[in-house]
């Protein structure tokens, strides 16, 4: 049962760990926002009455807002006032519908959490337990020092082989480093401390040492 070749096991572990690190890099909160946005687009097509009403109200609000902006409050005050009341009413109804539909967001977040658990966490633990004694590959005798061969065989296999525990640790570190290198150029730059901030800190330090306010 669950008999799998070493090469397939290597690839399977690599895929699962890559998916895990990619999810960590993107962030669970980002995935939840993407899932919620997708659900908001699909829900009206699935017949969810609240989302259908929310879409209709948003269309009406956009129409009223456009019409209100196209007229002058001074020249057509009565019409502008009427449109303004409609705008306020629609805004209130939309906010109420958003509060009602927000309950669905917790379910979406829960399902996304389950998907992450099923696709990454559970497979990793399954591999660790079920294939803990599997030898993925062997090093030729004498290639590595004996103490290193012994370490790579930890904790369940014979000296000279590489087991799943060491392999998963190595792959996890490599994938994490690669993702970090890919993300790094796109990270926001940390601004240098301004000269004013530096002068302010210097003044504070002088006050602490001398006990008198520093001259500006």
Curated annotation (Swiss-Prot):
Q: Which residues lie on this side of the membrane: Cytoplasmic?
A: 30-116, 179-216
> Pfam families in the record, alphabetically?
CHD5 (PF04420)
Is Transmembrane helix included in the keywords of this UniProt record? yes
Q: Which residues lie on this side of the membrane: Lumenal?
A: 1-9, 138-161
Q: Where is this protein localized, as stated in its record? A: Endoplasmic reticulum membrane; Golgi apparatus membrane
Q: Which gene encodes it?
A: GET1
Say what the protein does: Required for the post-translational delivery of tail-anchored (TA) proteins to the endoplasmic reticulum. Together with GET2, acts as a membrane receptor for soluble GET3, which recognizes and selectively binds the transmembrane domain of TA proteins in the cytosol. The GET complex cooperates with the HDEL receptor ERD2 to mediate the ATP-dependent retrieval of resident ER proteins that contain a C-terminal H-D-E-L retention signal from the Golgi to the ER.
One GO MF term attached to the UniProt entry = protein-membrane adaptor activity
Question: What's the name of the protein?
Answer: Golgi to ER traffic protein 1
Here the segments flagged for biased composition (Basic and acidic residues) are 197-209
* Membrane topology, record value: Multi-pass membrane protein
- Residue ranges of the TM segments: 10-29, 117-137, 162-178
The terms describing its cellular component in GO are: endoplasmic reticulum membrane; GET complex; Golgi membrane
Species? Debaryomyces hansenii (strain ATCC 36239 / CBS 767 / BCRC 21394 / JCM 1990 / NBRC 0083 / IGC 2968)
Any idea which UniProt keywords this protein has?
A: Coiled coil, Endoplasmic reticulum, ER-Golgi transport, Golgi apparatus, Membrane, Transmembrane, Transmembrane helix, Transport
